[in-house]
Swiss-Prot record:
SMART domains: CSP, RNB, S1. HAMAP family: RNase_R. The gene is rnr. This is Ribonuclease R. 3'-5' exoribonuclease that releases 5'-nucleoside monophosphates and is involved in maturation of structured RNAs. Its main location: cytoplasm.
Length: 725
């Protein structure tokens, strides 16, 4: 943390006494000239520069660059030290969520970071100053553990008349430390403009300096695929499979031992099919539906990954570390499991015998569940369909090349899906569907265009059948008093709901009548449906998504609010999600073949569940950030060829530094900086989430339609900069 010298304190006091009125640096010097200990102009200007560098003072702007107070420092309260995780914002101030108390969140100014970076585990303390809003100020005392070992950056060589100067520019804009590159770490003939991975060897917290060394050469900085790998590295994502793990996987094969017949049902005669995106290779799930006089019987067959991946094996250890497959733009996939398993042995490829775990559910003619069974089985998928194929068949645009039994099963599946959908809506499932896009790339991974995704009937059918299977498995395990990781989504807080209601009120969205303390998912769903025809419905859904927050895994049996379910888990994707694989192991250990496992093995897994859930939750956030960063990078790369083009859109967010406009053409948010908005000086009113002109009272609010010109691309922030027309 920065400790001000007496000279810096004097300068700060002079600026503060102006009570918000800008003061020129020269006036500060003049006011100090009569001091008996006048240090000289040079030292005063240097001290002012330090206060500006530390963001304790700021420039008011304009030609004169007059000084204003930006942040008031305070003494640290070192008698109580806490621990927490640091999250940095774009201006390199941040927040620490304490791990020691009730998860209180503290604000940390840039001058109090002490060299800590985004995601670091730190020891910190409160500052001796009043609470501001709902947060106390804090300062980092020391870094307990860096969030990552390697960081991605661009290696540059500057050659002047005297010597070569080596520089690294970090990809992450939140990496604020000034780097000194160890020349001995630089490989021979390493070219300028090369993407590399570096590590911090030493750091000076008082001056925000660090010594770094090159650890890995990724490739040409202008290569999009190299940049995607750098994004994964910066998010601590493993994008290569361990050679030892590959070797173990390659030794596995489909076995046909007689012992399987004792506990596996033979369902190879049933007309199972898979329906997935066109590019999918890891086919987790197959379905078969038959009609009976009293309703329907649904068979959801899920790849039996647990049969091949033993706990604590080399393959399992890596899968547990990865926690999930990653799907990046341009169909770039980083599988959780080696391809021998994910695309071959476990994938439910057509015309191949495969081991599965089946969730069999019988429904009445209204789509209400009557009975359920869970058991291991063997199936043969009769066909591999894409969503596009099935949707075209539904719309009578093409035929499916398959047997009549498959056609009958698909027809029954769609009828059942509609009934399940009606039951889900009745109990309060919230429809949060909104516009989504995909980036199309060429063979060199350069972006070509952005397409809007279509979520049609085939996608909805599979989603409904998977949701009911996931929920059924959660209920069966819960009713058998078996501990499991639930997928949970708590009720939104009263404060967040109140803020949402006030914001969407400006969009002519009807004011809901529900109680904010006891609101149900049914009431939220009804509120959405009431406004389906509102022109601002799309932004309403976006704001509601932000209000509801993110679902996560927990060993506590909490509700999944947006689905409207009291017990929910993930069972249907064990090839690509470690939680699902864990659920399968629980089924084997407790329900399918309990005699093949010891009580100690069951207890070990039970004790590990919370750690598994926490690890997956943490990694899921990194994966989401990775996917967002990759999307932003490729979108801005595509937009860089459209400088000067005019876009229409609506305001999707408002901040103290500007307006984010979601462009209709590509569904991407561009930034209109507050300093570039013409005709007035605009003030951010946080309570109302608007920008308001000081002279004209003109207001910009969320949902407003705008036109703006693309003026530049900020590749560091991966951001499109727009100018209002």
């Amino acid at each position: 943390m920065k400790v001000l010298t007496e000279l810096q304190k004097q300068i700060f006091t002079i600026v503060k006494k102006e009570n918000g009125k800008p003061i020129p640096p020269g006036i500060v010097v003049r006011m100090m000239e009569n001091s008996p200990n006048f240090p000289g102009k040079h030292l005063i200007y240097r001290a002012i520069d330090d206060l500006l560098d530390w963001a304790i003072l700021r420039k008011a702007g304009g030609v004169t660059n007059q000084l204003l107070v930006n942040y008031e420092p305070a003494e640290p309260l070192l008698d109580k030290k806490l621990q927490g995780i640091l999250t940095l914002g774009n201006k390199n101030s941040g927040f620490i969520r304490s791990l020691d108390d009730d998860k209180t969140v503290y604000y940390v100014h840039y001058s109090n970071l002490t060299g800590a970076l985004d995601g670091d585990l730190v020891e910190f303390c409160k500052l001796d100053k009043p609470q501001f809003g709902d947060k106390f100020d804090a300062a980092v005392i020391t870094i307990l553990k860096r969030a990552r070992i390697l960081y991605a950056g661009n290696f540059l060589v500057d050659q002047n008349e005297f010597a070569l100067e080596y520089k690294i520019v970090a990809d992450n804009p939140r990496f604020y430390l000034t780097m000194i590159v160890n020349p001995d770490s630089i490989p021979n003939n390493l070219a300028s403009n090369t993407k590399i991975a570096f590590q911090i060897d030493e750091y000076d917290p008082d001056n925000n300096l660090c010594k770094v060394s090159v650890q890995q050469v990724l490739g040409n900085n202008d290569d999009p695929l190299i940049n995607i790998k750098a994004i994964m590295l910066d998010n601590s994502i493993v994008f290569e499979t361990n050679d030892v793990v590959e070797q173990h996987a390659n030794k596995l094969s489909f076995d046909t031992e007689e012992q399987h017949k004792a506990y596996r049902q033979d369902l190879t005669d049933l007309a199972f099919v898979t329906v997935d995106p066109t590019t999918s290779k890891d086919l987790d799930d197959a379905i078969y539906v038959k009609t009976i006089p009293t309703g329907f019987v649904l068979y959801v067959a899920i790849a039996d990954v647990a049969h091949y991946v033993n706990r604590n094996s080399e393959i399992d250890i890596e899968a547990k570390h990865k926690t999930s497959s990653i799907y990046l733009p341009g169909h770039y996939v980083v599988p959780m499991l080696p391809e021998q398993l994910s695309n071959q042995l476990c994938s439910l490829n057509p015309a191949q015998k495969r081991y599965v775990v089946v969730c069999e559910i019988s429904f009445d003619n209204q789509g209400r569940i009557k009975t359920n069974k869970l058991y291991p089985a063997t199936i043969i998928s009769k066909n591999r369909f894409s969503y596009d194929q099935v949707n075209k068949w539904l719309n009578n645009k093409s035929e499916l090349n398959c047997d009549e039994t498959v056609i009958n099963s698909l027809k029954a599946a769609f009828t059942l899906s509609d009934l399940i959908q009606a039951q889900r809506q009745k109990r309060g499932t919230i429809d949060l569907s909104h516009k989504e896009t995909e980036i199309v790339v060429d063979e060199h991974y350069f972006p070509i265009k952005i397409n809007f995704l279509v979520h049609d009937k085939a996608e909805t059918m599979i989603e409904n059948l998977m949701v009911v299977a996931n929920e059924t498995v959660a209920w069966v395990l819960t009713n058998n008093k078996i501990a499991l990781p639930y997928r949970v989504h708590p009720r939104p807080s009263k404060k967040k709901l109140q803020s949402l209601i006030e914001t969407v009120g400006e969009l002519n969205i009807t004011k809901p009548q529900f109680n904010l303390d006891t609101v149900t998912s049914s009431q939220i769903a009804s509120w959405l449906n009431e406004n389906k025809d509102n022109p601002s419905y799309e932004i309403f859904v976006i704001l509601l998504l932000r209000t509801l927050g993110k679902a996560f895994y927990s060993v506590n049996p909490l509700m999944h609010f947006s689905i409207g379910s009291n017990h929910y888990t993930h069972f249907t994707s064990p090839i690509r999600r470690y939680i699902d694989l864990t659920i399968h192991r629980l089924l084997w250990m407790h329900l399918f073949t309990p005699d093949q496992f010891t009580d100690n093995e069951r207890d070990q897994l039970k004790q590990e569940l919370e750690k598994i859930a926490d690890t997956v939750n943490d990694t899921e956030i990194k994966i989401i950030n990775c996917e967002r960063n990759a999307n932003d990078y490729l979108t801005t790369l595509l937009l860089s060829k459209q400088i000067g083009k005019t876009f229409s859109g609506f305001i999707s967010a408002i901040t103290s530094f500007g307006i984010f406009m979601r462009m209709d053409e590509n569904n991407f948010d561009g930034l209109i900086k507050i300093t570039t908005i013409p005709d007035d000086f605009f003030i951010f009113e946080k309570e109302k989430m608007v920008l308001k002109g000081r002279k004209t009272n003109k207001v910009y609010k969320i949902g407003d339609r705008l036109e703006a010109k693309l003026s530049e691309i900020d590749f560091i922030q991966k951001r499109a900069i727009l100018t209002l027309i």
